[in-house]
Amino acid sequence: MNLYTSFVTKRVSRLLGVAIAWSAIAPLALSQAAFSQVVFSQVEQTVQFLPTPPDQGSPDGRQRGGATRGDCLEYQELTAIVPKVDGVVWSQTTSALPTFFFQVPAELTEEVPLEFVIQDSNDAYVVRQQFSVDAEAGLLAVPTTAELGELTVGESYSWTFSIYCDETRPSASVSVTGTVQRVGDEVVGSVADSSEILPAEQFRLLQQYASEGIWHEAIGIAIALHQADPNNVTYQETLQSLFTQAGIVPATDEVQ
């Protein structure tokens, strides 16, 4: 039993203002069907996401897993919940240890190894997490840990999330890749210092993050609000709007 399956870390995010029990690697309460329903509803954009252009020379990355074969076929539509900006899978965060979100198109089990890595400009590992998790198809949250280091303000990093899905070929995997940059947290002002943030204030903070192009905090708040009140139409529309503006197309329930 490894680190990620041997304990559950519970933390209350002051920023999100919603008490959420996070496992180290947390399947979220958005199943494949629910995720697709949210994303494909026809709504107006309630939050404006204005991303900063990616660093010149940033690799394009890969938002969708792509074609594969064998046991990996069911995971080929693995999708990173990260924007594609000017053709580059690119995001910004204010956190030294941001959470990443992925749509996993098929069930995960303890027998399916996963790996998430973040590397600096010299290819040194800042984050390297190898784990497994029992989770249905749907949205998966991957919080990062500080075992090797943290993201530095002003620096850009490459990341890769991989599912090693073919036991007959241990090196075979389906992967998504991109670039993340840490920026200063001036956008949040004094709000982030409050230990109790009402939903209306959270939504305003979400709007601030989105307008500054700070993806990880914006999408994290949007998902948390939707989880806390799944029948709230505004939260549904906001989540859909962010996916649409970021160029994220969810995988279908059926592998093509």
Task: Tell where the protein language model's regions lie, with residue ranges.
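Solvent-exposed loop/turn segments flanking beta-strands in beta-repeat/beta-sandwich domains
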Residues: 105-116, 120-124
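Signal that preferentially marks extracellular ectodomain short beta-strand elements
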Residues: 139-153
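Extended, polar beta-sheet/loop recognition surfaces of beta-rich domains
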Residues: 46-57, 132-135, 153, 165-204, ...
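Internal, hydrophobic beta-strand segments that form the core of beta-sheet-rich folds
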Residues: 153-166, 223
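Bacterial N-terminal signal peptides that target proteins for export
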Residues: 3-23
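Alpha-helical protein-protein interaction scaffolds
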Residues: 195-256
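Contiguous beta-strand segments within globular domains
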Residues: 87-104
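Solvent-exposed serine/threonine-rich low-complexity stretches and specific carbohydrate-binding patches
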Residues: 124-138
